Design a protein with these regions (language model features):
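C-terminal amphipathic alpha-helix
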Residues: 117-167
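Long, amphipathic, charge-rich alpha-helical segments that form helical bundles/coiled-coils
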Residues: 81, 86-88, 92-129
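Alpha-helical segments in soluble extracytoplasmic regions
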Residues: 52-96
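Immediate post-signal-peptide N-terminus of mature secreted/exported proteins
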Residues: 21-66
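Bacterial N-terminal signal peptides that target proteins for export
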Residues: 1-10
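Bacterial N-terminal signal peptides
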Residues: 9-19
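Non-transmembrane, amphipathic alpha-helical segments
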Residues: 29-43, 67-74, 106-113, 129-132, ...
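A structural signal for well-ordered alpha-helices, especially hydrophobic packing surfaces
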Residues: 45, 49-52, 56-59, 86-89, ...
């Protein structure tokens, strides 16, 4: 009985703990904060940019076990944060916030434009994983700013700016 509990407790913690890493729980709770998701993506971009700088520095430094260890860690960090961006876009915005519009339905073009921008962000995040091209995280930022302009009304933009400054 005790061994089963010893095994079950960590499995439960891991299973529920992994949910924290996703963009949103996908339970139809109605609790959303789009501006916070934008800020999270911006933080992930900053982390990817820093990781790329650190990787470049470590590649040029002397080869040592410590440097190789740090190199692997920064590469993993870059990959993880690009994946977080993809997850927020796919699991939060595309799956839950951007509502499909049929042809000739009001808002159809905005839906198409938003969806195309989000897909481009996912691809730029993917390229941030695949390469050390420092323009890719910058492209994520550019595309994200374009999405903000399309997605938020003036009140939403003001809210985003207010909480961004309050960080």
């Amino acid at each position: 009985m005790k061994i089963r509990n010893i095994i079950a407790i960590p499995i439960t913690i891991i299973a529920f703990g992994l949910n924290i890493m996703t963009a949103h729980c996908q339970v139809p709770c109605g609790i959303y904060d789009d501006a916070v998701r934008i800020i999270q993506i911006r933080e992930h971009v900053t982390t990817i940019e820093k990781a790329m700088k650190q990787i470049d520095q470590l590649i040029n430094d002397e080869t040592s076990a410590q440097n190789m260890n740090q190199l692997v860690r920064w590469i993993n960090t870059k990959e993880e944060h690009a994946t977080f961006i993809q997850s927020i876009i796919a699991d939060y915005f595309l799956a839950q916030r951007i509502k499909p519009k049929q042809n000739n339905e009001p808002g159809r073009q905005q839906y198409v434009d938003q969806t195309l921008l989000l897909q481009q962000i996912i691809v730029a995040a993917m390229k941030s994983k695949q390469t050390m091209d420092k323009s890719e995280p910058g492209l994520v930022s550019i595309l994200l700013n374009q999405f903000v302009e399309l997605y938020f009304d003036e009140h939403g933009k003001n809210h985003l700016n207010t909480i961004q400054k309050g960080k």
